Amino acid sequence: MKVAKWYNNHDIRIEDVPKTQPGRNEILVKIISCGICGSDIVEWYRLPRAPLIPGHEIGDVVLETGESVSDYKPGDRVFVAPKVPCLNCYYCTKGNHPVCSEVADRLPGGFAEYVLVPDSIVTNGTYLLPDSITYDQSTFIEPLACVVRAQKLAGIREGQTVLIIGCGMSGLLHVKLAKSKNCKLITTDINPRKLVYADRFGSDITVDAGENVPEILLARNGRKADVVILCA
């Protein structure tokens, strides 16, 4: 099968690798869509593990199942989590699952024709997609989950003023989610084009990051923000 293997940000190669057959508790999925996360292009984070196949925001369909898999069948449209926390380590017991110190299985990268899903992720990290969600839309499930968790930790509530610094994909998801909670949204970025999108997504006030943001915030909102979310 074909994969896009990352060696560094200036060296990505299309290579052939064997297509692995699923074990008794595993499934093989065919990748239909795969998003590009900001972390996929952060070299200092990726280089120690290079070369690697990136991509953890995927929409896929089940191609083959192991003989002991009963919850999924070929043809099922699924979302597969990139990793599953152990639920038992110090961090997991404190609710900090993203920094689990005992993660054993990670999803192989989605920049490939097929991905073999290990048994732990089949059991605890694979979800059927409703017909209303397209494969492209399903690539937003993982980043949206990060946004939901962040706003839960921040305790964002209706009526609060929320300042979002950075209007890339994550920042715009924060805008949509906070707007659904009837919050007042102020967004800032160094890129004017991103501020246009923030405005379209529902930001009440957009400010160029090169300006005096605190001063503008006080002048236009009458007070400082209740919550600041950093996405830059």
Regions found by a protein language model. Name each.
Residues N212-R223:
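Short amphipathic alpha-helix with an adjacent loop that forms part of the alpha/beta core around
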Residues A225-I229:
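Short SAM/SAH-binding signature in class I
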Residues S39-E43:
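Cytochrome P450 core scaffold surrounding the K-helix E-X-X-R motif
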Residues T134-E211:
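Mid-domain Rossmann-like dinucleotide-binding core that forms the NAD(H)/NADP(H) cofactor-binding site
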Residues T20-C34, Y45-Y90, P130-S132:
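Glycine-rich beta-strand-centered segment in the early N-terminal region that forms part
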Residues C86-I165:
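NAD(P)H dinucleotide-binding glycine-rich loop of Rossmann-like/cofactor-binding domains
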Residues Y7, P18-K19, A50-G55, V103-G109, ...:
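Short Gly/Pro-enriched turn/cap motifs at secondary-structure boundaries
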Residues S33, A81, A209, C231-A232:
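Short, well-ordered coil/turn residues at beta-beta hairpins
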